[in-house]
Every structure is written in structure tokens, then in C-alpha cells.
Design a protein with these regions (language model features):
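Short glycine-/small-residue-rich Rossmann-like dinucleotide-binding loops
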Residues: 53, 105, 128-130, 156-157, ...
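Short beta-alpha connecting loops at secondary-structure transitions
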Residues: 98, 190-193
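Glycine-rich phosphate-binding loop and adjoining beta1-alpha1-beta2 segment
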Residues: 69, 73-101
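Glycine-rich beta-alpha-beta "Rossmann" dinucleotide-binding loop(s) and their flanking helix/strand
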Residues: 139-144, 164, 168-172
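A structured beta-alpha segment of the ubiquitous adenosine-cofactor-binding alpha/beta core
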Residues: 49, 94-145
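Acyl-CoA thioester-binding alpha/beta core of soluble enzymes
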Residues: 1-82, 111, 115, 120-123, ...
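Hydrophobic alpha-helical scaffolding
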Residues: 104, 160, 167, 194-198
Length: 294
């Protein structure tokens, strides 16, 4: 624990790895600046401004794009999404259903265009510490106060106001997912790649759809580590029903004692379009690569 504390003092994403999930009853999101949509939902698709990077946020917005939300991904020319430096198929899978925009928020033109995008957005999703935007003069609370019924989704490791940071791997370890039900002398290991990211992305997308459906706006503060701990604890403590998948003569089923639920056969998602590339300011790139004015 002393090593973890020293790492956190240095601003590193580190965590202890408890043997048992510690998230029983953990609160994984908070809601503030609540409001209700004053008018009927517009007939146009919901507009989402995606300021998130890496995996959890981009996965949430990718799923929302599949649900007919119009998603525009905004990147900084000096600090683009780091996932773009990794495997291209993964980046395309996360962002191929979105349009893209490159904006320098330290330049007057970039700020003007960004503020116009903020004004037209119904939903904002970001995964930075609050001070990253506040240093540039942007505040979630102020944006929400002027726009009843709109949503601002913030995804961080432990919460917007928490001093600790986290990425998917260490958040999963902090949730107790580095150990399997095995002998006590077994060493810890990662259970999948950065599991806290997809768990958080799925929950974020579901929460956005739920709030949008009933017209409830506000700031949704999602914390990856507590959320993953809650999911892990539910499985560990038997709070959920474990359904075992298995092939059947007429397709796949989930089998729970005497109950059998037909499901589609498992399959990997396929890349349907290339992610929008970073393009010149004042332009938007579609997934087909054609530039058009914003």
C-alpha cells in the first residue's frame, strides 16, 4: 500500500489489487445540475459532442451512434486521441460511425467553432479531469444551466472531484479482478484487457439513452473503478444470476437451470468504416472521407 500511495502522490494510475471484489454497494455515478427538457424532443437526431479518448468514452459514443445519435468527435491537434496510435482496426471500430473535427481551443477560431458546437449539442461526453476544460474557460455546470434537459457525461477513474486517476487495467485490478477463484498462493494477473473500460462504456451508453428518453438532463459523473467493483462484487457475491451459454440444435441459448433463453450466436464486431482523420480546422470529415463545412 505504501508503494501505491507513493505512486498516487506522483500522479500515476496505480492501485492495490484486493483478492475479493470490494464494490458491494459502491456508488458508481452521481447526478447533479438536474433539469427536465422543457419542450418536445426535436425531430432531428440527438447531437453528441464526443471529447473523450481511448476506450470507455469512445465505446459509449460508438454505441450511441449505432442508436442513431449524431456523433461528432473533436480532437486537439496537439493532443489527439492516443488510441489513434494503436491498432487501426480498434480505432476504426470505436470511431468509424462518427464525424470528426480538429480544433485548437487555444486559438480564437478554434474556440469560436467549439462554442458553436457546444451550443448545438444535446449531449457532451468527455473523459478528462475537470481542470482540463476549466483552464480553457469551459465549465459543465454553466453549460447545463443554460440548456435544460441536456446531458454532460464525465468519465473518470474515481470521480470528477477525486484526486486519483485510473485507466482500464488498474481500475479493474482495484475492483478485485486481478485474482481468479484459485489457491491463495496464485499470483494476480489481468483478467482481460482493461476491463473497466468496456464495462464503463456500456453503462455510460445505457445511462445516456435512459436519460434522453425521459428528457432528464444534468451532469452524469461516472467513475470507472467503483463501477467495475460493483459489477465484480455482484458476480462474486451471487447477486446476479449466472447464465451459462451453450450451443443448441436450433441456435445458441443461455441456460439457467430449467430456463433456456434463445440468443444470437456470439460474433466479433466488424469494422464498417474508417475513423475520421484529423483534418484542417473549419472542416468536418465524414466516415467516407469527404470533407464538408461544419
Amino acid at each position: 500500500l505504501a508503494l501505491v500511495e507513493r505512486g498516487r502522490m506522483m500522479g500515476l494510475a496505480v492501485a492495490a489489487a484486493p483478492r475479493a471484489p470490494v464494490g458491494h454497494g459502491a456508488r458508481f455515478f452521481t447526478r447533479s445540475h438536474e433539469s427536465q427538457r422543457e419542450a418536445e424532443r426535436p425531430s432531428r437526431p440527438l447531437r453528441l459532442l464526443d471529447l473523450s479518448t481511448l476506450w470507455a468514452g469512445p465505446l459509449a459514443t460508438a454505441l450511441l451512434a449505432l442508436a442513431c445519435v449524431e456523433v461528432l468527435k473533436v480532437e486537439s491537434p496537439s493532443r489527439p486521441d492516443g488510441a489513434g496510435e494503436g491498432p487501426a482496426p480498434f480505432f476504426d471500430l470505436m470511431n468509424g460511425t462518427k464525424r470528426g473535427r480538429c480544433l485548437d481551443l487555444r486559438a480564437a477560431d478554434g474556440r469560436r467553432d467549439f462554442e458553436a458546437l457546444l451550443d448545438s449539442a444535446d449531449i457532451v461526453v468527455e473523459s478528462a479531469r475537470p481542470r482540463a476544460l476549466s483552464q480553457l474557460g469551459y465549465d459543465a455546470g454553466s453549460w447545463l444551466e443554460e440548456r435544460p434537459g441536456r446531458l454532460w457525461v464525465s468519465i473518470t477513474g474515481y470521480g470528477r472531484d477525486h484526486e486519483w486517476i485510473a485507466f482500464g487495467d488498474d481500475a479493474a485490478a482495484a475492483a478485485g479482478l486481478a485474482w481468479s477463484p484459485a489457491p491463495a498462493d496464485e499470483a494476480p494477473c489481468f483478467c482481460g484487457d482493461a476491463l473497466a473500460d468496456p464495462i464503463t462504456g456500456l453503462h455510460a451508453a445505457a445511462l445516456v439513452l435512459l436519460h434522453a428518453r425521459v428528457g432528464q438532463g444534468g451532469l452524469l459523473d461516472l467513475a470507472m473503478a467503483p463501477l467495475t467493483a460493483r459489477v465484480a462484487a455482484a458476480e462474486h457475491d451471487g447477486l446476479t444470476t449466472a447464465l451459462e451459454p451453450g450451443p443448441a440444435s436450433q441456435g445458441w441459448q443461455l441456460v439457467d437451470e430449467e430456463r433456456r433463453v434463445p440468443v444470437a450466436a456470439p460474433r466479433a464486431r466488424v469494422v464498417r468504416a474508417k475513423a475520421p482523420a484529423l483534418v484542417a480546422e473549419g472542416s468536418v470529415e465524414t466516415t467516407g472521407g469527404q470533407l464538408r463545412p461544419c
